[in-house]
């Protein structure tokens, strides 16, 4: 009788131990995946930038900003005119996105949306200029000659540029250079 109780107790405790280890392993995997998902998926909703989060290899970005190659990007989900977008970015100590190269938006998912960037037509200079006053490099937008003067440029992650009236409401991307 005592041998039977000992064997039964060992069987029950062994089974419960295996179940406990399985649950702990599952919990560990779920926690790892949820933290990885949180740090990879950017929040595209605008809001105050209070908390800092590590999003980039070499720098920290504010909450709701995406870190990529030592720059921080705010990708809006609301639509504004080009000037409203520019003012919002300036209020966040950033500017509308000035593309340095066509690969700059590789981190974005394949979004169908067009976003205002910091490129508009300057009547004074009769040229397309970035918000900081520098000229547009033709290799970025080979078809820029077909853009209509007096417009602003919206861009999507597939590398397409669209010239629209600056009063049209679009989503927008702010860029903050940290280095």
Curated annotation (Swiss-Prot):
Disulfide bridge map: 58-70, 61-72, 89-174, 152-166
InterPro entries: C-type_lectin-like, C-type_lectin-like/link_sf, CTDL_fold, NKG2/CD94_NK_receptors, NKR-like_CTLD
Location in or out of the cell: Cell membrane
Residues modified by glycosylation: 83, 132
GO CC annotations, alphabetized: external side of plasma membrane; plasma membrane
UniProt GO molecular function: carbohydrate binding; transmembrane signaling receptor activity
Extracellular side: 32-179
UniProt membrane topology term: Single-pass type II membrane protein
SMART domains hit by this protein: CLECT (SM00034)
PANTHER family, per the entry: C-TYPE LECTIN PROTEINS (PTHR22800), NATURAL KILLER CELLS ANTIGEN CD94 (PTHR22800:SF252)
Protein name per Swiss-Prot or TrEMBL: Natural killer cells antigen CD94
Gene this chain is encoded by: KLRD1
